[in-house]
Amino acid sequence: DNKELSISNDGRGTRYNAHKPTFGDFSGWPFTDVTSPLNPFSQRDTYLKIAARKPTGTRGSTGLLAPVDMDGKGLWVKAPCYFECRFLAHSAPGTWPAFWVLNQTKNLPGDELDIIEAYGGRGEGNPNDSGYYATAHYWQQKDSEGKEVKAPWKHINMLEIGSKTSWSTTFHTYGLRVGKGSTVYYLDNIEVFRHATNRYSGEQPLFFLVNYAIGGASGWKINLERYDNSSDMYVDFIRVYQGK
């Protein structure tokens, strides 16, 4: 029952945050505002282009978008709800594209659901060029014995599903439905992972983030010199549906 869009069909007039709401950023090349001389955002045909660049003498720049500001004000939806994003990104050592949802604010317990978290490059230290991870994180949550609550995750091998192509070779649509009972992850409308909906995901509102991180908290080394320290991600659309 996902018939009502939570935001406008074309997104015109919508304002976005270029940093991780209520928390610090995590990219080795900093997430950068649209007002910066190193603005990473532009429109190419009908696509949003996120350009990661590191001109000589700079720390570099890249992009993140979220519909919630640093005070937590913005677009939130509650279960049952559905999120999807269609994008293409460059696979190279250090690239770290992701589409994910979050409901944790400040230092309170909450959930992070990574619909796609991909790491570029091949070989040791670059683990999933041909696939990606769908991962839940249950932050600051303890069970009845005081132990950290274990969160489910799965590596998705894209070369065995659907069109059998990687996130770096063609556009794919990555979706997530958070229901009252189950949380389901999709690749091009094909279910690829499912787990029970955690308490915080089922009871508290969520917002999405899309980003093109370069190195940073991932721990993967950056090696983009062969590409003149430049790399791009193209986003076709992001859709958010609020169920009834």
Regions found by a protein language model. Name each.
Residues D1-K244:
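GH16 jelly-roll
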